[in-house]
UniProtKB/Swiss-Prot annotation:
Biological-process GO terms, alphabetical: electron transport chain
Misc note: In radish there are 4 ferredoxins: 2 are root-specific (R-B1 and R-B2), one is present in both leaves and roots (L-A), and there is a minor form which is leaf specific (L-B).
Subcellular location, principal: plastid
Source organism superkingdom: Eukaryota
Residues given in the record as [2Fe-2S] cluster binding sites: C39, C44, C47, C77
Designated name of the protein: Ferredoxin, leaf L-A
Matches recorded under SUPFAM superfamilies: 2Fe-2S ferredoxin-like (SSF54292)
Keyword Transport among UniProt keywords: yes
A molecular function (GO) term: 2 iron, 2 sulfur cluster binding
GO cellular component: chloroplast stroma
Gene3D superfamilies, A to Z: 3.10.20.30
Location of the 2Fe-2S ferredoxin-type domain: 3-93
PROSITE patterns referenced in this protein's UniProt entry, alphabetically: 2FE2S_FER_1, 2FE2S_FER_2
Length: 96
């Protein structure tokens, strides 16, 4: 399946199409959207965003705890869309 992923970035909103087997960070990059990242392995917080609406599968990540996930935090480098989803990017500093 292909879903619409909307990124709310400091520069404004941008929407991409993302297959359900593509990480949302990769889909953003392919569309020329510059998002923060570091490890690309789901084991740090550089790429952290927050899900505003919709859902993702981020079972590949190993950094966020259950409370952070419940609050909506997402590691974009290790998240597949499972519906149309809106994500606020650049939210690493909000996780502390």
């Amino acid at each position: 399946a292909t879903y619409k992923v909307k990124f709310i970035t400091p520069e404004g909103e941008q929407e991409v199409e993302c297959d359900d087997d593509v990480y949302v960070l990769d889909a953003a990059e392919e569309a020329g959207i510059d998002l923060p990242y570091s490890c690309r392995a789901g084991s740090c917080s550089s790429c952290a965003g927050k899900v505003v609406s919709g859902s993702v599968d981020q079972s590949d990540q190993s950094f966020l705890d259950d409370d952070q996930i419940a609050e909506g935090f997402v590691l974009t480098c290790a998240a597949y869309p499972t519906s149309d989803v809106t994500i606020e990017t650049h939210r690493e500093e909000d996780m502390v």
